[in-house]
Amino acid sequence: MNIKETNPSGGCHVVILGAGASIAATIRDPEIHGLQLPSMNNLPDVIGLHGCLNHFPAELIQDNFEATYSNIAEHDPGNPYLKVMNDLIYSYFDSMELPLKPTIYDYLIMSLRDKDVIATFNWDPFLYQAWWRNALHGSSPQLLFLHGNVAVGYNQEHNLIGRAGMYSKDRSIYFEPTKLLYPVKHKNYASDSYIRKAWDILQNRLDKDTCNTHNVTIFGYSAPVSDVEAMGLMKKAWGSVDDRNLEQFEIIDIRTEEEVTYSWRDFIHTHHYDYRKSFFESSLALYPRRSDEAFFCHFLPLTPEEAFVESNPVPQDFQTFEEMWEWYQPLIDKESQK
């Protein structure tokens, strides 16, 4: 029995993305303008912030931009060069575009359904661009931008998101660009209405009392000790690991298994985790659009066929969107037959 033969069910899959996911999405085919995706260690070099940083005391400047920014924001929050840096960062990320070929983000969008959620800490527009260009092909997952995003706008009055700086089709609703939550040491996730809403939804999906989430995938997010508030909010929703014996925690990361399991030790129930170094080794790529069904076949099978269900790995070498959409279409068709 192949997983694609199972009847679609409704359990939620939560995917949480960090910078490593966006980097992975542009390895095979780089960003269309040749722009480099910066990390917190090289962001001043890539974006060109040293002219601004030179206006601050040398003792505030650290190797990691997150530490530098936190020091500056605490030392001199009203300094005009802080706003200049904010504007330069926003402008750089806003100019980035995915290549015009299927990327890992396109696979990710197509491998989930509208019952699922992708939450990202990234500022770059790649995830939203992938969602937008695949939106007409099957139901798509809900997107949550936990630190804001250059591509996403929000209308608070109507509680709707759309493309930043754009209007709805009837031009009655304007989507105000979301604010980027810059890397201060103590982030206030309640300070912005959109970011607060995104966190509320994520916490709801992680809470076993409010949602039937069986699969959580962490992709390229290092669980930094500096982001105490983020980890605290997720841990509060997840609860005690002793109570999460029916969930599977999956980590896609190039770090060692020992490193990543230690980082996420407060979320992993004993052996209930999978460690992968590539997206294509993950449940998302092995059981696209059917990861929840695969979970039940493996852990709570009703028949011998379910216990030995075969995977349906998505091909890794699509060169056109048409090829990719054609491959996913039988899975989408079966969903409409429920």
Residues of each region from the PLM?
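Active-site gating loop/helix substructures
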Residues: 70, 75-99, 130-208
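SIR2/sirtuin-family catalytic core signature
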Residues: 1-17, 21-25, 204-338
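Short secondary-structure boundary/capping segments
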Residues: 28-40, 133-136, 161, 231-235, ...
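Short helix/loop capping segments that flank catalytic or ligand/cofactor-binding pockets
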Residues: 24-26, 127-130, 153-156, 226-227
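Secondary-structure boundary elements
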Residues: 110-117, 133-139, 209-212, 220
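Gly/serine-rich nucleotide phosphate-binding loop at the start of the catalytic core
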Residues: 1-127, 146, 327, 337
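Residues at the C-termini of beta-strands that transition into short coil/loop
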Residues: 122, 147-150, 253-255, 290
